[in-house]
Amino acid sequence: MSILKIGIDEAGRGPLFGRVYSAAVVLPPEGTIDLSMIKDSKKFTSKKKLKKVEEYIKENAIYWGIAFEDEKTIDKINIRSATFKSMHTAAKDVIKQLPDDVDYSLMIDGNAFKPMMVFKDGQIKQVEYECIVGGDDLHKNIAAASILAKVARDNYIEDMCEKHPELIERYDLAKNKGYG
């Protein structure tokens, strides 16, 4: 039996402002949908194209989930722990959608992850995972997760700028997205 690979990535770990977002994605097997447009979110030059691909992923992914941790959590537990927490939440959103008999593992973009426990088959088990540096360039599931996380965070920043125009005037937040 094959193992379902859940791609996970984050957006917002580096900025000085705002939430950290994570996404988890399972795409259909290659050849069943067009995966050619799915790439690392940082490689998109057009915001419009990025949003179009995000919509395509949401319509065509088998499973997907998005989660965030806010500034208060980041300040309380630190950005690294908040990132892992949002990754766990996004992964659990996907895992809850899976049939009980499906085996799965996580593919994490990056070099670190906090092991995650789930209740399965009447036991508490650690979820298998692999950290992959540059994973968003190597695996479509991770690239798709990077897109969902980035668009969700960008939408949050845009919403904040609409509600608080002074964030644009004082910090140019609409352009720099909190990266300083």
Please place each PLM-identified region on the residue numbering.
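RNase H-like, Mg2+-dependent phosphodiesterase core
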Residues: 1-180
